[in-house]
A protein has these predicted regions:
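Acidic/glycine-enriched connector segments
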Residues: 1-151
Length: 151
């Protein structure tokens, strides 16, 4: 990951009504924070909306890159780079991680290595919420900045 980077985390069942707020956060991270790489998963509505917001922003900011996070080894579960994405990323060391926790572990790896986190998580009994809390705890250790989108 090069330059300033940002990861998205949110609930799978997110309402599409959050899109405008999400797009505004993407644009803010590009213009105010100098983010050039956005990393997103592909397992739910929030991930789809986050990817759509970055794809829309790329029309105005062509230097911005959109990267798809792969929690499963590409040889085991091949996924071609989707339209609008610039690349895929499979975190190193994930080969021995059990499939059951691969998504959680891949997400945590990315949180440990990005500069910014845009989050939309409100349900305390969820992996998304736990990852946001993890990011908040990491904030002082690795200078991660967390943006929480309001419901």
């Amino acid at each position: 990951m090069n330059g300033k980077s940002c990861f998205f985390i949110g609930h799978r069942e997110t309402s599409e009504a959050i899109y405008r707020t999400l797009y505004a956060a993407v644009e803010q991270h590009i213009l105010e924070y100098g983010v050039t790489e956005f990393i997103v998963g592909h397992y739910g509505v929030f991930d789809r909306l986050a990817a759509s917001a970055v794809k829309a922003a790329k029309h105005l900011y062509p230097d911005v890159k959109l990267i798809l996070l792969l929690p499963y080894h590409p040889a085991e579960r091949p996924i071609p780079t989707p339209d609008g994405f610039d690349n895929t990323f499979y975190p190193p060391g994930m080969e021995s991680v059990p499939r059951k926790i691969a998504i959680v572990r891949a997400n945590r790896y990315v949180v440990d290595h990005v500069d910014y986190l845009i989050a939309y998580a409100w349900h305390p009994a969820s992996n998304a919420w736990e990852l946001v809390e993890y990011g908040r705890r990491r904030k002082g250790q690795n200078h991660l900045q967390v943006t929480i989108l309001k419901r």
